[in-house]
């Protein structure tokens, strides 16, 4: 007895969208996309980096690109409504919205937006990122922005992965000094290299996070042509700042806190003045497996 299996196109029945090439962020703004293994500290890094840019006198917009919508709460001190939720309330008639419905001011004037995402298993994260940028442009909210930071979910290398890369100048990859994080970073490098053929985005460098040492990261950088732009050790004040729902710049200025603050300020300054586009050559899975570890 034979059975007939109906085959469907990948994504059929899901919320899908093609990115509109006309929906771009104005030239002049520095646009950074932050990637990395899930749970590595991208939102912490993004929020503190946004705060650092604001400390340098820049007008900053942070866009959280994760259905968990927890990218900006240390800036706003609360969980803000997502763009997709707000659009659903008005049946996707964006002309009915006001900027205050979906954009919120956080620490030191940093403007915050959470794109949100479709229900699990029903679509692509790139859809809501594209809709978010479109909405911001419709309301002329990007015209006076100096820095835009996209905080992107996990290390998913799919169609939605390309949405922030359509707009970004540079990509920062957050990693720890361990195999899993660096393995994920290698996959992200591969994806960015592929997308860079069509978009202006380039690799900006590596952020070593929650790591006392960087020996494994250094090995990877030496082989692939990447560069560590900042190193944040496993400082308990960073963990406590998340629990306090604030940035590291709002914590009591202990020696450890001041060191972290200065590292973020240095990273922000380098991204503005001293960043060099990196080519980056990803390794094959077997090569990275053999590279990392102790001799």
Swiss-Prot record:
Q: What is this protein called?
A: Light-independent protochlorophyllide reductase iron-sulfur ATP-binding protein
Q: Explain how, and how many, cofactor molecules are bound.
A: Binds 1 [4Fe-4S] cluster per dimer.
- Catalysis performed (reactions): chlorophyllide a + oxidized 2[4Fe-4S]-[ferredoxin] + 2 ADP + 2 phosphate = protochlorophyllide a + reduced 2[4Fe-4S]-[ferredoxin] + 2 ATP + 2 H2O
Bilayer-crossing regions: none
- Pfam families the UniProt entry points to: Fer4_NifH
Q: Which family does it belong to?
A: Belongs to the NifH/BchL/ChlL family.
Q: Which residues bind Mg(2+)?
A: 43
Q: Where is the signal peptide?
A: none
Cited HAMAP family: ChlL_BchL
- Per UniProt, the enzyme's principal EC class comes to oxidoreductase
Describe the protein's quaternary organization and the partners it interacts with: Homodimer. Protochlorophyllide reductase is composed of three subunits; ChlL, ChlN and ChlB.
Q: What's a single GO MF annotation on this record?
A: oxidoreductase activity, acting on the CH-CH group of donors, iron-sulfur protein as acceptor
Cite the binding residues for [4Fe-4S] cluster: 124, 158
